[in-house]
């Protein structure tokens, strides 16, 4: 009796020990499962307790650039728990000057004891008159290579057949080889030991030879590109085989780490074993519960003729027929003949009843579905968020209307293409006519993803908080559609871009018009930066976002990229967004956004107003593609007359244009801290207009001008003054800006 109890205790202890050993091989629950785009599968891991503890070769490194490294140097691109891992190996290259040779050193790798080269690789040489060699070292050394010959540019046929490119057809390294090296050499003349074969014509199209390992099917030779510089590719994908330990399945015995519903297989390329899920299971076989049952009935991997007869079971499936049916040899369920007629009648009656019921409830169901869909779109498009933010910002009482989907369709004639006013990065703008014949502009977002929805809600909130005569007025929005719609006032005269560069308008903007437009835009930006309840940076100021009404009054539009700056901050770090040609270079390189970014963009707009040329034009010469550099260079070299638009330049306004050009140059200085604030820019431009008006008035009434300006004005202290200072004009302009509209 005592003997039997002892045997029982030994068995219990053995089972408990076995489970304990297996449990110690399982990773922690908090292990990192991804590095960049690579999923990390156990037994691999990137920290203690996350990889197989019996072998440090499975300890990977995730560097700052989100790259996964093997042995700390080899980048991993994919891990498969079937015993394969994809990595990137460097190429070997050796370049030659004409008639001279540059000696290179073979490139070598030493893999860990758990890894070896897969036979699913090719050893490839690209070059003319060269020989490549790959050698592996282990219990049995192995070498392979190939020869490539050519004295002229090979035909571009995509073949790697020994002319400009060669590859090993049978790549099978010896068992348990984990160290290898490879390289290439140029063929020499056996008579004088020179590189005569490498003549001038070959040097022109093949200055270098390249030897590299690459996974089969991952490289296609192109003689027109690869012989020159291998398309600048320096690393190639290579397949490695891996296994657990250095024992066979039988030798490892109960210490194997194969989980439940998996089997152990001896490695075919080196010592050790791998685990695979049993048939009917899928998952990671190295986890204790990693192999999960595959539901063949759902995954459609069964052979039952009717999916309804499929019944899933653990590790497989069965085809079972319902009561009254028999399973035939083709795995189909059939019913005896005498029962078919009765079933047919029952089916017909049932179908008629269902059709009648469907007709009765169709209308109600359709209405319910339509209402639910509109409600779903409303929430999906941020309706709840918009109402909450409008209320939280104290904007619930503004004249802001929520439009219906039907109203938007009628207003745009079903979103007819003829109603499209313009298209941009944030969406499409349609011309709409409301039931009261009010003409509006309707902006339809391009995509209905979360980022676009946030930008849409952001634009609504920004526009709702701006009350300025030179900012496009928001009227409302529609959130019942798949993509959100924004409704704002319709500006009849197109954009400033159309008037300066487009063919839609036969426009001839005078200097007075252009100066006034510049003053209005500058004043608007100064208001947004300094006088709005929360400072706002537009972030996309350009002529295409400045609308003109019938009186050529400027209206700043498209606030989809704008940013609200907290009162306690002067700048924000954001993802760079804007339009090339107008984008602040300092913001582009640092990601730091502040009001000086709008100042730069406005400076480009002012240059367009002065020159009549586009901010970025690839049709201009290389030195003048970017208007800013072209304009600043002309200003500094006293060549301003070459770039100023002929429609605005004359002797009467030359000084004004020179001053405006100087302001534009100041706005586009490379360093943001050297640019003026928008308030200062607006004041300077306003001073230009005041000075222009003063000169015009003095020319018309010279006697009065002499009396007021040339004479003396009595001061409060009894002294006299004979001039009106620029600072006084500037102060008046600043006061006008800060007051707002």
From Swiss-Prot:
Signal peptide limits: 1-23
Induction line: Induced by INA.
Compartments where located: Membrane
GO molecular function, one term: protein serine/threonine kinase activity
Covalent S-S links between cysteines: 249-264, 258-275, 277-291, 297-310, 304-319, 321-333
Tissue-by-tissue expression: Predominantly expressed in green tissues such as stems and leaves.
Domain EGF-like residue range list: 245-292, 293-334
Ranges where the Protein kinase domain occurs: 415-698
A Pfam family recorded for this sequence: PK_Tyr_Ser-Thr
Cytoplasmic compartment segments: 364-741
Annotated catalytic residues: 540 (proton acceptor)
Topological relation to the membrane, as annotated: Single-pass type I membrane protein
Gene Ontology CC annotations of this record: membrane
Residue intervals passing through the bilayer: 343-363
GO biological process, one term: cell surface receptor signaling pathway
Topological domain spans for side Extracellular: 24-342
Glycan attachment points: 37, 59, 78, 100, 103, 141, 192, 199, 232, 246, 261, 266, 303, 328
Family: Belongs to the protein kinase superfamily. Ser/Thr protein kinase family.
Full protein name: Wall-associated receptor kinase 3
